[in-house]
UniProtKB/Swiss-Prot annotation:
The keyword DNA-binding applies. The lineage of its organism: Eukaryota, Metazoa, Chordata, Craniata, Vertebrata. Transcriptional repressor that plays a role in various developmental processes. Specifically binds the consensus DNA sequence 5'-[AC]ACATCTG[GT][AC]-3' which contains the E box core, and acts by recruiting chromatin remodeling multiprotein complexes. Its main location: nucleus. Residues 279-288 have a biased composition (Polar residues). A zinc finger (C2H2-type) spans 344-366, 384-406, 412-434, 440-463. The gene is zbtb18.2. InterPro entries: BTB/POZ_dom, SKP1/BTB/POZ_sf, Znf_C2H2_sf, Znf_C2H2_type. It comes from Xenopus laevis. This is Zinc finger and BTB domain-containing protein 18.2. Pfam families: BTB, zf-C2H2, zf-C2H2_4. One of its GO terms (cellular component) is nucleus.
Amino acid sequence: MEFPDHSRQLLQCLSQQRHQGFLCDCTVLVGEAQFRAHRAVLASCSMYFHLFYRDQLDKRDIVHLNSDIVTAPAFSLLLQFMYEGKLEFSNLPVEDVLAAASYLHMYDIVKVCKGKLKDKELNSGEKIIDDGEKDDKPVDSEEHHEHSFDASQQKISTLDSVKPIWKEKVSGLSGLSSDLIGVNSVPAEAVMCKRAAGKTKANDSSPSSPLSQRSANHTHPPSDRDGALDLSFKPMPGRDSFHPSYVFGQLVSDSQQQGSLPLVKHEQDLLSEQEDSQAKSPKSQQVGNPAKSLVTGLGHMFTGNGNSHTREDDLYQDRDESEDEMDSSDLSTSGVLVSPGQICICPLCSKVFPSPHILQLHLSSHFKDKDNSRIKMSPDGSVPTCTICGKTFSCMYTLKRHERTHSGEKPFTCGQCGKSFQYSHNLSRHAVVHTREKPHACKWCERRFTQSGDLYRHIRKFHCGLVKSLVV
């Protein structure tokens, strides 16, 4: 059995209790105004109060609202709506109610206020149009007829004075018809327009000029100086020396393009960065890889003294020699005494090193292949390639990072909880959990979160309607 009037009676009882101050458990302060209310009603009607009371229910007896956004009359109106289900604007500005409803996340009220503002704009626009139509209506009076008659006589006299001038101008056009003048005699009309430019320019802009003169001026085609379109090629400023040095991965062998060498090297750097973020499949290499042909051409271009190794190979060779000279096993048995403040521990194998430089040299050994040899870019254009999926990378470091996705290796372990991660930046994000820091704050409800992803999920869940309303 249902009682349809139960909800209405419940609201009436709650409204009476609020006016009597009975069982009111919170006070809302808007500037100097105080409003006694029930937390359950506020949290049920406003998402702002719901989030406000959810964390610390016993310590939120007084709620301070921003008086710069929420005015006391607007909050009183919204409070009346919460307890009675009625919204009566009376003489209160709709903008104040909209601001207060947006601040309190009352989305139904926000939609109503926006609808009223749109209707107000439409009504004001229609009123302006109606007033303009009334002003444009002719006045049936004798004075108006006399004035229009005098104006027409003045226009006719002005037109008669202009006709002899036109006759002289047209007589010099070799008797061409009026239909062909606009096509074949543009230079002649251009000279005529230049001579009368000082007179017709003022007549076009002035509203009191005769209609016949204005129409005659607008019928003239534009002169060569004003209306001609310049289709000549003009190079862009600051890009005169820009010449593409390759097309689809093949180097241009033109001897005149001497300034294209730095551009090719710049394209190689961009290519390396693109390989890190988006790997290439073996199928695309079989069809024809433009990057491979470009690297092949560069291998022959930058050779010197008969050596075809790149600078990257030299760096790898220097690192290998340094690692051979200073092995970690020799460090542990050398008996060198180092102060505790200078000890550097490898985060991957927990070995101890006397300086950060030696630690960096040791870290590079973790990214070698199992046979203790580095995959280097050879002169024929081969690059480090994943043996499982066939993706290619610019260096060995990115290849090793990629191989963790197949092997599931997690070399970075948290020292407090023992949780492991594949990448170091994931371990850094996880460390915030143990420090109890909450650097990410919501600008609508002032809640704070440890991770940025938690903040984004919170906004999508609780403030999605408000964000859309603000964007609109």
